C-alpha cells in the first residue's frame, strides 16, 4: 500500500513520494487538518511530513494513504453517520456540552420545552441537547442527518474524529440509544426494484423475517413519464426491532427536494443500517475497536 504511487512502475523515493502524496491530497480537495484527523495525527505533524522536516516511515505511509483514499472523490461507496442519539446519566448539561461536545453553551439557544418527555433543551443549528430534572432521564444528545453534518464541522475544527467523540461519550457513561450508519452508492451498484422483486420471490436469504417496499413516484410533479417506477424504498426487518435496513433511491429524493436531475445526482442509492439500544452500543464498540487497531 505504501508503494501505491509509482512512476513507470518504479517505486518513488521518500521525497518523490511526499510530493506525489501532497499533490494527490490537493487533487482530492482535502485540507491538512481534515486528513490529519482521519489519520489520527496532528495537523502540525502532517505539515512537517509534507515539508520533509521529519522522516516518513513505511508504517506512516500506509496510514496516510489509507486515510487519503477515504476521501477519493471517485470511490463508488462512502460511509457516514446519519443519526446519533446518546443518553448521559447526569444532570450536568454544562459538562456534556463543554467536555463531550466541546461546544460553548453561551452560543446555544435555550428553550424551556423538549421532546421525548424532556422539559428543556439547548440547540445550535441542528444539534440538540435535552435535559430534565428527572435523574433517570439525564441528558440526551440528538443529531439527525443535518445535525451530524454540522457536528462534523465542529469535530474538524476541534481536530477530533467521530471515533474520538464516541470514545469520549462512552468513557463518560454515555448510553447509545440509536445509531444510523449510511452507505452512499455513487455509481448505481444497487438495483433497488430488483432487490424488492427478489424479496417478494423469497430469493433473499436473511435472518430478517419481513420486508416492506414503497414507491414514491406520485411525489414527482415534473415531466418524467414513468412516475410509477420512481423512488423505490425497501425496508428489510421489522421497523420495531433494534436493527433493520433501509435502502432507497437517493437520486430521486435529491430530484424531488433540490431539483437535481436524476442522472446528475452525486448519490444514486443509499443503504442505511438503523440500530437501537444494545445493537447501537455493540456497533459503536466494534467501530472503535477497528479504529484502534489501525492507529
Predicted regions located by residue number:
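Structured, helix-rich domain cores that form ligand/interaction pockets
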Residues: 2-16, 27, 70-293
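Short basic helix-loop element that most often maps to the first helix and adjoining turn
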Residues: 19-38
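Conserved hydrophobic/aromatic packing and binding residues within compact polymer-binding modules
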Residues: 21, 35-36, 46-49, 295
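Acidic-residue sensor for enzyme active/binding pockets
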Residues: 32, 44, 50, 270-272
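Residue-level detection of beta-strand scaffold positions
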Residues: 32-35, 50, 63-64, 68
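Recognition helix of helix-turn-helix/homeodomain-like DNA-binding domains
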Residues: 40-56
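DNA major-groove recognition helix of helix-turn-helix/homeodomain DNA-binding modules
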Residues: 57-74
Amino acid at each position: 500500500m505504501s508503494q501505491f504511487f509509482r512512476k513507470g512502475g518504479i517505486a518513488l523515493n521518500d521525497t518523490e513520494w511526499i510530493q506525489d502524496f501532497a499533490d494527490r491530497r490537493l487533487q482530492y480537495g482535502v485540507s491538512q487538518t481534515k486528513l490529519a484527523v482521519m489519520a489520527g495525527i496532528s495537523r502540525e505533524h502532517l505539515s512537517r511530513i509534507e515539508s520533509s522536516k521529519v522522516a516518513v516511515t513505511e508504517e506512516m505511509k500506509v496510514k496516510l494513504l489509507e486515510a487519503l483514499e477515504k476521501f477519493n472523490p471517485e470511490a463508488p461507496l462512502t460511509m457516514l453517520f446519519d443519526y446519533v442519539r446518546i443518553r448521559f446519566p447526569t444532570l450536568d448539561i454544562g459538562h456534556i456540552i463543554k467536555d463531550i461536545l466541546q461546544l460553548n453553551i453561551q452560543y446555544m439557544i435555550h428553550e424551556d420545552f423538549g421532546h421525548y418527555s424532556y422539559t428543556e433543551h439547548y440547540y445550535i443549528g441542528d444539534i440538540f441537547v435535552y435535559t430534565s430534572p428527572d435523574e433517570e432521564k439525564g441528558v440526551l444528545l440528538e443529531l439527525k442527518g443535518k445535525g451530524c453534518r454540522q457536528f462534523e464541522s465542529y469535530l474538524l475544527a476541534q481536530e477530533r474524529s467521530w471515533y474520538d467523540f464516541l470514545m469520549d461519550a462512552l468513557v463518560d457513561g454515555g448510553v447509545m440509544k440509536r445509531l444510523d450508519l449510511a452507505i452512499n452508492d455513487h455509481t448505481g451498484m444497487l438495483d433497488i426494484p430488483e432487490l424488492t422483486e427478489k424479496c417478494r420471490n423469497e430469493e433473499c436469504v436473511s435472518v430478517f423475517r419481513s420486508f416492506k417496499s414503497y414507491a414514491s413516484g406520485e411525489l414527482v410533479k415534473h415531466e418524467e413519464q414513468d412516475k410509477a417506477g420512481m423512488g423505490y424504498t425497501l425496508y428489510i426487518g421489522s421497523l420495531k426491532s433494534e436493527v433493520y435496513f433501509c435502502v432507497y433511491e437517493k437520486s430521486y429524493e435529491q430530484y424531488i427536494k433540490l431539483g437535481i436531475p436524476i442522472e446528475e445526482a452525486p448519490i444514486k442509492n443509499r443503504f442505511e443500517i438503523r440500530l437501537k439500544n444494545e445493537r447501537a452500543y455493540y456497533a459503536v464498540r466494534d467501530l472503535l475497536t477497528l479504529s484502534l487497531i489501525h492507529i
